[in-house]
Each structure stands twice: as structure tokens, then as C-alpha cells.
């Protein structure tokens, strides 16, 4: 965990982790009924839609209450913000106190090794 984090951020990261584990999968209305419908969320807009009206025995609907705390939104569980790195030039823009590097999947093994070595010199955490 990032040592520079204050107690408030640590507490919010724990809450974010807890909320992520409890969050349900949101499926579109009647996704199970027709093969042509994907299960990706679509907001129900029908005039008589039971899901839109939040009737009982219906799956939960996407709502602001399911979001993680604003202060830690987009933050890695380690307490750093992720920065996607493609080459050595990208490393120079990273602030090691609040950001961590994630090497892109398209980077080959030779360049990946160079990037990891440079990150170690600059005390930048590599997430993968």
C-alpha cells in the first residue's frame, strides 16, 4: 500500500473494495429470454416496464448508490493511480508518490525489461 496515503484515503479504499465485492451484475431487461439480446446493461424505457418502476422481485437497476467514493474512484487497490506505459519516454511523466506504471500488453519482452529496470531506478511501482 502507498505509504503517502492518509487515513481517510485508506478507509475509503477499504469501503471501495467492500462495495466492489457486493456490487451485483447489471443485466438488461429480459436478457435471458431472447438469444439475440446481449446481457450488457440498457436503461429500461418502456411505458409499462416493471424494472423501470422498481417493482419488487426485480433485479436492481443501475443507480448512483452503487458507485465507489469519489475521492478514490479510478484508484488501484494499492492506492496509486495507474498510468499505462508503452515506452521509456512515458515513464518520465510519472509521479512516483501518487502514480504507478502498468506496462501495456502490446510491449515486447525486451522493451518490457528495459521499462522495468528504469522504473526501479526512479522508484516507480510497476503493477504488472
From Swiss-Prot:
Query: Gene encoding it?
Result: rpl32e
The family annotation for this protein states: Belongs to the eukaryotic ribosomal protein eL32 family.
Q: Name one Pfam family in it.
A: Ribosomal_L32e
Keyword field = Ribonucleoprotein, Ribosomal protein
Q: Does the keyword Protein biosynthesis apply?
A: no
A GO cellular-component term linked to this record: cytosolic large ribosomal subunit
Q: Which residues cross the membrane?
A: none
HAMAP family linked to this entry: Ribosomal_eL32
Q: Does the keyword tRNA processing apply?
A: no
Show the GO MF annotations: structural constituent of ribosome
Give the GO biological process terms. Answer: translation
- Protein name, please? Large ribosomal subunit protein eL32
